[in-house]
Amino acid sequence: MLLLRLNTTSWMNSVLACVMLVLGLFVPIFANAYTGVTIVMSAETPANLEFVDQLKVELAKNKLVNLRVNVITLPDTEKLVVAENSELVIALGVKALEAASKLRRSTPVLGAFTPLPAFNSIMAKNKRELGNFSAIILDQPFSRQMSLIKHVLPEAQKIGILLGTTSSQYIDYVREEGEKRGLNILEEKVSQEADLIPQLKKLLDSADGILAIPDPTIYSRETAQPILLTSYRYQKPIFGYSQSYVRAGALAAVYSTSKQLAKQAAEIAIKSRPAPSDLPPPQMPKYFSIMLNYQVARSLNIPLMDEDEILKKMLESDAPEAM
């Protein structure tokens, strides 16, 4: 009996030693895991509120993760205090990301609804580093936009783009993705608003369509109507970057909804929770939708497939991209 007891004790000690070793490996990781999410909104817009609601839904789906969600808006700046690693800050919009970037550098921050140039500028200005500072970039991958163009205009060979100060940095990527799909990219630079329509007309003389790349120098509420009307006179389509641009007269656009961005943010929050200082690099929207303007298509004599059919074909060939 004594021998049996000694053997049993020895076996138990071995098991306990293994357990302690395993716990020793995992405790440092989970000790720093954040327990909550603080969402900072630039404003209480419908898009931001929809994002918040969907994020809560997505987080609730994971029964193994119980993250409390706190929501504040920029006017409540005195409330923008978080317990460093114990909370993930999700900033909605450029102004919100700017405010969140001023928190302690150890605080994990994830941006959304933020263009890539704005993210890079904020990160450099506030000396933040990748790892605990990231974002779901607002811009859609050029590969995805070219895919939409080829599905809508399969015979297209030349696509024009207007380049401003911000969008000029993308030209090499646009050309690369265009070449992959047999599209020759034509570009004209716009340095001031007076050059906008003349440069657009140059493109419309040769291009089969225009791809709009977000740039404050070129695309705004004030310039939308003259751009769309000019392209219509030339009987050439505009491929926009938002639902509102399609409603205004663009032929098509690929975009991500607030719910889709919230789903992606929730996935990042859950995956990175054990290691808050290990956020993924900035990434393009993973989930997306498309919108077509059938009235514009009829006016331009462009036959279109069903919206769902085009989306299905795009999804089959689409792959999410990191920056």
Please annotate each region the language model reported:
Residues 2-19:
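Bacterial N-terminal signal peptides that target proteins for export
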Residues 31-323:
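Short hydrophobic alpha-helices and adjacent helix-cap/hinge residues
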Residues 26-28:
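N-terminal signal peptide c-region/cleavage motif recognized by signal peptidases
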